[in-house]
Amino acid sequence: MGLFKKRKYITVSSKNLDENNDVENQPTIPDGMWIKCSKCGKILYKSDVDDNFKVCPKCNAHLRMNARERIEFIIDEGTFIEFDKNMMAANPLEFPNYEAKIKSMQEKTGLKDGVVTGLGNINGYKTVIAVMDSNFMMGSMGSVVGEKITRAIEEATERKLPVIIFTTSGGARMQEGMFSLMQMAKTSAALAKHNEAGLLYVSVLTDPTTGGVTASFAMLGDIILAEPKTLIGFAGRRVIEQTINQKLPSDFQTSEFLFKHGFIDMIVERKELKVTLGNILRMHS
């Protein structure tokens, strides 16, 4: 019976395995050429997304922009003057590894902390602007973020100019404890004085705007705008559901939900933001 037993063979590929056809000779894809949409999951050319103001061309998801990108998009070219560029956080509570975390974020983002403030023109109208950056410790508000925003508001009050703040934040920065929480009161007090002077404050809510930022300056605007599908809230959805023992609507804490319930004034597509802000400044100039 052994004569009829099926023999075992080793399959040898006929593909040329010559060293000249090594991996180095195969086509390569440059790093950073593709990006995956965080909403629909589609793989997209990064250049197409960048050319579309970082909006997904497939599902219209407004992907996150960093502070420098947003300033370049919103402010007229050559008019931006930055405030307090080199202000850096201390570690007043001696929180373990906080300095190392800050340094790591600075190297990653090119920023000293989570907000960029300054003076510039939007369609020819001068304004003070503050733009938060979620790439820097999720835009958390510590002493530097609060101080820079407060100084920007005070500068606007002194110059009798409007203020525009683009918010994106996970809330207060836990590493700074009470020093972080007091920024809520400080920024709000500065805005109160700005308001008493009869000046305009426009708040633009971008994804995500949560925690202490929502509970302070983000919701104090004379006019409150938001990008589509922006997450806006104070406590997290799961915490609220567990507290009230109820299931929340699927669109809860979205800009659309808040607009429907009167908490924000307008939802604006990103590509229309500069025109919209320019028109608001023109009407109030």
Curated annotation (Swiss-Prot):
Binds 1 zinc ion per subunit. Its cofactor is Zn(2+). It comes from the Bacteria. Its EC number is 2.1.3.15. Residues 33-285 form the CoA carboxyltransferase N-terminal domain. Component of the acetyl coenzyme A carboxylase (ACC) complex. Biotin carboxylase (BC) catalyzes the carboxylation of biotin on its carrier protein (BCCP) and then the CO(2) group is transferred by the transcarboxylase to acetyl-CoA to form malonyl-CoA. Pathway: Lipid metabolism; malonyl-CoA biosynthesis; malonyl-CoA from acetyl-CoA: step 1/1. Its main location: cytoplasm. The keyword Metal-binding applies. One of its GO terms (cellular component) is acetyl-CoA carboxylase complex. HAMAP family: AcetylCoA_CT_beta. GO terms for molecular function: acetyl-CoA carboxylase activity; ATP binding; carboxyl- or carbamoyltransferase activity; zinc ion binding. It comes from Clostridium acetobutylicum (strain ATCC 824 / DSM 792 / JCM 1419 / IAM 19013 / LMG 5710 / NBRC 13948 / NRRL B-527 / VKM B-1787 / 2291 / W). Zn(2+) binds at C37, C40, C56, C59. It catalyses: N(6)-carboxybiotinyl-L-lysyl-[protein] + acetyl-CoA = N(6)-biotinyl-L-lysyl-[protein] + malonyl-CoA. This is Acetyl-coenzyme A carboxylase carboxyl transferase subunit beta. Keywords: ATP-binding, Cytoplasm, Fatty acid biosynthesis, Fatty acid metabolism, Lipid biosynthesis, Lipid metabolism, Metal-binding, Nucleotide-binding, Transferase, Zinc, Zinc-finger. It holds the Pfam family Carboxyl_trans. It is found in: Cytoplasm. A zinc finger (C4-type) spans 37-59. One of its GO terms (biological process) is malonyl-CoA biosynthetic process. The keyword Hydrolase does not apply. Acetyl-CoA carboxylase is a heterohexamer composed of biotin carboxyl carrier protein (AccB), biotin carboxylase (AccC) and two subunits each of ACCase subunit alpha (AccA) and ACCase subunit beta (AccD). Belongs to the AccD/PCCB family. SUPFAM superfamilies: ClpP/crotonase.
